[in-house]
Regions:
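Extracytoplasmic/secreted cell-surface and envelope-processing proteins
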Residues: 101, 186-189, 286
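Short intrinsically disordered coil segments
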Residues: 65-70, 105-109, 193-194, 290-300
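Short loop/turn segments at secondary-structure transitions that flank enzyme active sites
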Residues: 57-60, 88, 97, 119, ...
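Alpha-helical scaffold segments that mediate packing/assembly in large oligomeric complexes
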Residues: 71, 77-81, 86-170, 299-300, ...
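Assembly/oligomerization interface modules of large self-assembling protein complexes
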Residues: 2-89
Length: 314
């Protein structure tokens, strides 16, 4: 676990203290989080909150004759628990380094912190990477366990349609896709049997496009595991992101940073440094409500996976 990372005058950071020849930093726009874009968001008022999800559907009955008895039915719910966990980072920078830089360093650091948070959130929710134990099961593993998986073949347009059919049989609509970076270029030339394009890029030059009429987000923040999946399709209203606190930034000019053994690795006052701390409090869970088409929670799930052709079965 890194506790002593610091922005300093090493070779990797020298471009931030520019020579007189060049004083401009060219950097790409930070990649966003597909979970924060697509999932249903709930504002939470406490660390733990329960979300009711339909678990038992009522049944109607025909009444026999004029005086037949009407039968009773039941409807029930179960709780999906959202547990807030903290996502945080501290970025220390020596004051002398800040003084010599000819660009606003913190303006460059802040968007990259936001991007790093998006990476962690997507990796945890989609593939379970570094996922807190209190969070719900990741989307990829849950979809595979439910049998909602198609392996990518020569005809991706057919594969995506097959995936949509699996979800429809479970009683869930597809209202969006998330994919590996670069998949849009593979899709752009695909046509239906009558010559219609199945993928439409955004003509305004913005990221994303539509696949079979539904939005497609390429996950370009480094969290996507391309060895596992090409694409995830699903009903994104069933993925729930609970927000207890948006990303907050706080600057420190005094204090110490310690490691896991409580040893001081940086004393801000003594070593003339400042530190930016970013904190976010967030929860994740997936709702898997009962449907008329599939009453079994073990074989029903609101997401499906187009598995990578190179996937190796264990």
């Amino acid at each position: 676990v890194p506790y002593n990372s610091i922005i300093s005058r090493d070779a990797s950071n020298d471009p931030l203290v520019p020579t007189p020849v060049s004083a401009q930093i060219i950097q790409e726009m930070p990649a966003s989080s597909v979970m924060l874009q697509r999932a249903l968001q709930r504002r939470l008022s406490s660390k733990t909150q329960r979300q009711p999800v339909l678990d038992v559907l009522p049944t109607a009955y025909f009444v026999s004759g004029d005086t037949g008895l009407k039968q009773s039915g039941t409807q029930d719910w179960k709780n999906v628990e959202l547990v807030v966990e903290e996502l945080a980072v501290i970025v220390p920078i020596p004051e002398a380094y800040l003084d010599d830089a000819q660009v606003p360093i913190w303006d460059e650091v802040r968007p990259r912190i936001v991007e790093a948070f998006g990476n962690k959130i997507d990796a945890a929710c989609l593939f379970g990477t570094d996922k807190p134990s209190t969070w719900g099961a990741p989307i990829y593993q849950s979809a595979v366990a439910a049998g909602n998986v198609v392996t990518a073949g020569a005809d991706l347009s057919k594969n995506v349609a097959e995936l949509g059919e699996l979800l429809a049989k479970d009683g869930f609509p597809v209202n969006g896709f998330a994919s590996r970076p670069g998949l849009n270029w593979k899709l752009v030339g695909l046509r239906t049997t009558d010559g219609q394009a199945i993928y439409q890029p955004d003509l305004q030059g913005r990221p994303g496009g539509t696949l079979y009429g539904y939005p497609l987000n390429e996950v370009s923040n480094g969290s996507w595991d391309a060895t596992e999946a090409e694409l995830i399709a699903g009903d994104w209203s069933k993925a729930i992101i609970g927000l207890r606190q948006d990303i907050s930034f706080k600057m420190f000019t005094e204090g110490v940073i310690t490691d896991g053994s409580n040893a001081v690795v940086l004393n801000l006052m003594q070593q003339d440094a400042v530190a930016l701390r970013a904190v976010m409090r967030i929860a994740y869970a997936t709702a898997n409500p009962v449907t008329r088409l599939n009453a079994s929670a073990s074989t029903r799930y609101p997401f499906g996976v187009l598995r990578a052709a190179s996937y190796t079965y264990s």
